[in-house]
Every structure is written in structure tokens, then in C-alpha cells.
Regions:
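Residues in flexible loops and secondary-structure boundaries
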Residues: 3, 36, 40-42, 114, ...
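Small-side-chain structural scaffolding
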Residues: 7-9, 32, 39, 117
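Short N-terminal segments immediately surrounding and downstream of signal-peptide cleavage
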Residues: 11-28
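Amphipathic, charged alpha-helical segments and their helix-to-coil junctions
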Residues: 48, 92, 96-140
Length: 140
């Protein structure tokens, strides 16, 4: 996966979702100091939540793409925006449900540390993708 490769090797490695999740899991578990047992119990729930969130977002993006068309009306933009925030509320409710389930496995401190690790992982991925984009734009 991109996150774990030097810039020169990134183009050669196409990371599939399973590999990406494994690396994300390892990174987050390490940063949150999870035990093997905690890791085995937590991450199936975490990825279950991620899958549900992905499905909700897929619907939101489908609606948002309608706004790309130049003939989109103000009423349609209003609907797109309202749908987007409805989807975000659905995700927030779902996440609260999963937090309750996480608390059956982990302390609040470890849940916090996992969320922080997830943010750092995402930021690192964005930096790497930006570096790749910058390299492509320089013609290298």
C-alpha cells in the first residue's frame, strides 16, 4: 500500500481493500496500544461500521453528482444539500450505536486513541497522495 512504501515504489503497488485494511488495522492497533484480544474483537466491528458508512456515503455521492450538471436548478441543489446532511445525520447515529459496542470491548481512552490514530493514518495517506500528484505534475 502507498502508506508504507517509499515514493519510488508506490506506482508499482496497487493496494487492494484487504491489504489496505490490514495495514490500517496494524497502524491503529499499534498507536492505541491494543492487545491481540482487543484487536481481534474490535476490528471486525470497526470494519462493519466502515462498510455501513461507505454504503450511506455511496448514496450521498450519487445525489451529489447530480449537481455537476450545468442545468441543475436551485431546488435540486437544495435537495442535494438536504440529502447530504440527512446522510451525515444517519452516519452520526450509526456511529453512536457502534461506540456503545466498542465500549463493551475497550476503554474510552483506547477508543479515543483509535479515533486519533485513524485521523493520523488518513492525514498520512493524503500527504502521500499529494506527493504522488506533485511528482506527476513535475513530469517525474
Amino acid at each position: 500500500c502507498l502508506f508504507f512504501l517509499p515514493a519510488s515504489a508506490q506506482k508499482k503497488d496497487k493496494c487492494n481493500e484487504t491489504e489496505f485494511r490490514a495495514k490500517k488495522q496494524a497502524y491503529m492497533a499499534k498507536k492505541a496500544h491494543l492487545t491481540q484480544e482487543e484487536t481481534e474483537k474490535f476490528f471486525p466491528l470497526y470494519f462493519e461500521f466502515q462498510d455501513k458508512k461507505k454504503e450511506i456515503n455511496k448514496g450521498a455521492w450519487g445525489n451529489a453528482k447530480k449537481g455537476i450538471k450545468p442545468e441543475t436548478s436551485e431546488e435540486q441543489y437544495e435537495e442535494i444539500i438536504d440529502n447530504y446532511f440527512d446522510e451525515q445525520e444517519r452516519i452520526a447515529r450509526l456511529e453512536k450505536e457502534y461506540i456503545k459496542r466498542y465500549r463493551e470491548i475497550l476503554s474510552n481512552k483506547k477508543i479515543y486513541m483509535l479515533y486519533w490514530a485513524e485521523i493520523k493514518f488518513s492525514r498520512n495517506m493524503l500527504k502521500i497522495l499529494q506527493e504522488i500528484d506533485d511528482t506527476k505534475n513535475k513530469g517525474l
